[in-house]
Amino acid sequence: MPHYVKRRGRPVPGTIPDALGMFQAEVRFYREIAPVAGVRVPACYQADETDDGTVLVLEDLSAWRPGADPVLAATVLAGMHRRWEERAPLRWPWLRPVAAAADLVERLFSQTWARLRAREDLASSITSLGDALTGRVTVAEHAIAAAGPLTLVHGDASMLNMRTSPDGELALVDWEDVSAVPGVVDLAWMLTSSVDPARWDEVIAAYGPAGELARVLPAAVVQGLLSLADTTAGSAAAMDWISRLNEAARRT
């Protein structure tokens, strides 16, 4: 049976992967959490930290379709969040907390927004929200703490990190951002990164109670703007990001 081997070198000191211990966290996820998480993830055959970095030997899901139906994804995420509500941070105290490395994200956003703001393809609502977030990213990150009980979250629940089997089963991959924060954080990022605004209400309804979504959307917008900065102005990818960010701004 073919395997997928994922190797990560030692992160550069002072970078976000270094500050968050992202690569080590994924190793620990597969060692400690994956067997009991309650969601489908790739089977893990090896999860080690070495002198050179980390190595994972995982089930090969290359035959599965990239992405997932967002309604199904919302249902799967909600089930995991309910399962581990108020339990995850006690069972795995090493999980990343709310506002981890917020100062580094603040600095990165300030540098990026100064360049991104000049793009002509931004909607005025996005420009206004980006301006409002400048110098307040740390505040937005800490606001997440009031969005609900802490639980196990994927941390990067975009469609890029989901796979669908030929018979419709959904798997979550790439657990480098696994955290213990309010579950609505996963919903906010899935919407902002991946879901057509026309389906947001449908997806939110499938997730269930999400009354604090507006509280966490500003932090999701920060990450979305950083992602938008990596696109070419006027490209299809940029326009998709702008559409979703505009919806997030409208709901913030």
Residue ranges and their predicted role:
Residues D60-W64, D174, A188-L191:
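Short helix/strand-bridging catalytic loops that position acidic/His residues to coordinate divalent metals
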Residues P2-L95:
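ATP-binding pocket architecture of kinase catalytic cores
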Residues M1-V5, V139-V185:
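Active-site acidic catalytic loop and adjacent metal/ATP-binding pocket
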Residues A19-M22, P66-D69, A101, V105, ...:
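Residue-level preference for long, well-ordered alpha-helices that form the structural scaffold
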Residues P42, P209-V216:
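Short, surface-exposed acidic
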Residues A78-E85, G130-G135, V195:
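Short amphipathic alpha-helical signal-transduction/dimerization elements
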Residues R28, G183-A210, V221-A249:
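Active-site activation/catalytic loop segments of kinase-like enzymes and analogous catalytic loops
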Residues W92-A143:
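Active-site catalytic-loop/activation-segment of kinase and kinase-like phosphoryl-transfer enzymes
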